């Protein structure tokens, strides 16, 4: 995990593994740049009916042209604040794609 990312252990502790298959992205970068992810992750990402992305790092790095992605994050820096038109500290729910 990078910065404050959740781990597979965190997902299991929260019970997510009882609801769905949990897989790592394979990327060590902050966020989820698909070019750094495993083939399995990218295939599952592309096949998913719904993608909900959590965190500003994913908002910044998850580039999925032609793919609808719902982003949930808190604005933590002036650059993103300007990009989304919201003050720092704002909680955002945005759809891209």
Question: What positions do the PLM features span?
Answer:
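C-terminal functional extensions of proteins
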Residues: 7-97
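Short, charged/polar "capping" segments at the starts of alpha-helices
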Residues: 1-6
């Amino acid at each position: 995990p990078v910065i404050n990312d959740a781990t597979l252990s965190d997902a299991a502790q929260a019970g997510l593994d009882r609801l769905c298959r949990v897989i790592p992205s394979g990327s060590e970068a902050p966020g989820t740049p698909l070019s750094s992810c495993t083939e399995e992750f990218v295939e599952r990402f592309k096949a998913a009916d719904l993608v909900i992305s959590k965190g500003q790092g994913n908002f910044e790095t998850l580039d999925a042209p032609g793919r609808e992605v719902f982003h949930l994050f808190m604005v933590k820096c002036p650059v993103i604040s300007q990009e989304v038109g919201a003050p720092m500290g704002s909680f955002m729910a945005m759809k891209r794609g």
